[in-house]
């Protein structure tokens, strides 16, 4: 991707230089529709809107900078926007514009996809091992995301144990993944026991092996791994000072024994997994932090009463 960004950046900067020195001339009609009616201002705009953002994204991508994906998204969007301005406002047309629009859209989407697959996670968390990595699945999709929670692991763990339809929900978009039933804001004591082989995170009620994961392994208050034939959903709770670093990794791919269902599922994962998983992580964060605050307040009240 950095190579593509570099080529686009150099092309845009070369075009800007050509406009500025007069070696590129669109004619009086088009020049009059450039910013301030001046090719020089047009050159400045082209360099500022396309050339420099693409160059910055290229360098950030090449160096593996933390915000490289966001910069790539922005640069791709600006390129598409520039092409729209050329066609609609400046009314300058060339065969390169469709190609540049496609490149801009592809660059922007690539940045978005990589950002969404690693949302909140550090480079070490993305590259490092996770519980459940040893389980082999047909892997076509892999996402590692994370969130910092101002509550200890023992106050985050219960919210994971009770995930699923007919239980606490998924703390996400309840109309989509929980039949419209609001996800619980309380710890449900009836769903706190975890054992290898149990059905986990059921997506229907009553739970069914076809619509649930199975608990593949767990380490109490530290790790929880759910698995099924075509995927692994793993959670890691890492102590982080007084809080928790909650890391989640989803690996999934086609189950050719159910090809049609896998195809539909693959499309849904690509489109819907990120917004729902992000909301789920933030939902767990909110609930665990609220519980921690309530317990701290109750403890302070009890101490004051004594």
Predicted regions and their residues:
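Topology signature of small-to-medium multi-pass alpha-helical membrane proteins
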Residues: 1-124
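Short beta-strand segments that buttress and anchor functional surface loops
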Residues: 200-203, 223-230
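Intrinsic-disorder/low-complexity, polar/charged segments enriched in Ser/Thr/Lys/Arg/Asp/Glu/Gln
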Residues: 140-148, 223, 232, 243-245
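Hydrophobic ligand-binding cavity/cleft-lining segments
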Residues: 1-10, 115-199, 283, 289-290, ...
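Alpha-helix-centered segments that form part of catalytic cores
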Residues: 192-215
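Hydrophobic pocket/interface hotspot
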Residues: 13, 156-159, 215, 246-248, ...
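A short, structured loop/turn motif at beta-sheet edges
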Residues: 63-64, 150-154, 217-221, 237-245, ...
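Beta-strand/loop substructures that line and gate deep hydrophobic ligand-binding cavities in soluble
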Residues: 126, 227-286
């Amino acid at each position: 991707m950095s190579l593509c960004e570099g080529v686009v950046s150099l092309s845009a900067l070369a075009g800007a230089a050509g406009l500025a020195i007069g070696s590129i001339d669109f004619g009086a009609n088009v020049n009059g529709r450039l910013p301030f009616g001046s090719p020089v201002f047009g050159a400045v705009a082209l360099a500022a809107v396309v050339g420099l953002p693409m160059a910055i994204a290229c360098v950030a991508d090449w160096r593996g900078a933390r915000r490289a994906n966001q910069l790539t998204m922005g640069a791709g969007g600006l390129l598409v926007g520039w092409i729209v301005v050329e066609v609609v406002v400046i009314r300058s047309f060339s065969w390169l514009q469709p190609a540049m629009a496609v490149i801009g859209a592809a660059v922007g989407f690539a940045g978005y996809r990589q950002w969404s697959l690693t949302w909140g996670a550090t480079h070490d968390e993305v590259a490092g091992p996770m519980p459940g990595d040893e389980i082999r699945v047909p892997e076509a999709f892999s996402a590692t995301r994370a969130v910092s929670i101002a509550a200890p692991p023992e106050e985050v763990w219960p919210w994971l144990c009770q995930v699923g339809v007919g239980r606490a929900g998924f703390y996400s978009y309840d109309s989509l993944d929980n039949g419209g039933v609001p996800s619980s804001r309380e710890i449900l004591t009836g769903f706190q026991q975890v054992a290898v082989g149990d059905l986990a995170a059921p997506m229907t009620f009553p739970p069914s092996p076809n619509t649930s994961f199975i608990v593949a392994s767990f380490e109490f208050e530290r790790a929880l791994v759910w698995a099924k034939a075509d995927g692994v959903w793993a959670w890691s709770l890492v102590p982080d000072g007084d809080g928790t670093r909650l890391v989640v990794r989803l690996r999934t791919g086609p189950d050719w024994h159910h090809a049609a269902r896998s195809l539909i599922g693959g499309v849904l994962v690509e489109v819907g997994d990120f917004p729902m998983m992000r909301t789920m992580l933030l939902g767990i964060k909110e609930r665990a932090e609220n519980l921690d605050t309530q317990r701290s307040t109750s403890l302070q009240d009890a101490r004051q009463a004594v």
